[in-house]
Swiss-Prot record:
<dbReference type="InterPro" id="IPR052048">
    <property type="entry name" value="ST_Response_Regulator"/>
</dbReference>
<dbReference type="InterPro" id="IPR001789">
    <property type="entry name" value="Sig_transdc_resp-reg_receiver"/>
</dbReference>
<protein>
    <recommendedName>
        <fullName>Protein CcdB</fullName>
    </recommendedName>
</protein>
<dbReference type="Pfam" id="PF00072">
    <property type="entry name" value="Response_reg"/>
</dbReference>
<dbReference type="InterPro" id="IPR011006">
    <property type="entry name" value="CheY-like_superfamily"/>
</dbReference>
<keyword id="KW-0597">Phosphoprotein</keyword>
<keyword id="KW-0902">Two-component regulatory system</keyword>
<dbReference type="GO" id="GO:0000160">
    <property type="term" value="P:phosphorelay signal transduction system"/>
</dbReference>
<feature type="modified residue" description="4-aspartylphosphate">
    <location>
        <position position="53"/>
    </location>
</feature>
<feature type="domain" description="Response regulatory">
    <location>
        <begin position="3"/>
        <end position="118"/>
    </location>
</feature>
Length: 120
């Protein structure tokens, strides 16, 4: 089973992703509300996949992505973005993010991105 770390500063967004993924039989390994928590939890939990919000307090998603990829260059991270963040998404993909999903989350788009990244 694929274990996922869900990262977003908005609890309702984490809940939405959790519901979509659990319904599709993914296991939520953990949740983080900022990039610093995300990097720490990644190191502890070693999930198969991370969904990472870009705009967060303490440490944003780009910085957390860098930290995670420094720790584990093979990490699979999907960035979660608002519509008008194309430049930042491009930066994240160039850094090593595997895919992105746009808010508000649509179940099919989330599951398609996860399937692409996980090779299902």
């Amino acid at each position: 089973m694929t274990r996922v770390l869900v990262v977003d500063d908005a609890k309702f967004m984490r809940v939405k992703i959790r519901e979509i993924l659990e319904e599709a039989n993914y296991i939520i390994a953990g949740e983080a509300a900022d990039g610093e928590q995300a990097a720490d939890l990644y190191k502890k939990l070693r999930p198969d996949l991370v969904t990472m919000d870009i705009t967060m307090p303490v440490k944003n998603g780009i910085k957390a992505l860098r930290d995670i990829l420094t720790f584990d260059p093979k990490a699979k991270v999907i960035m979660c973005t608002a519509m008008r963040q194309q430049r930042i998404v491009t930066e994240a993909i160039e850094l090593g993010a595997k895919d992105f999903i746009v808010k508000p989350f649509e179940e099919t788009k989330v599951l398609e991105a996860v399937s692409r990244v996980m090779g299902h």
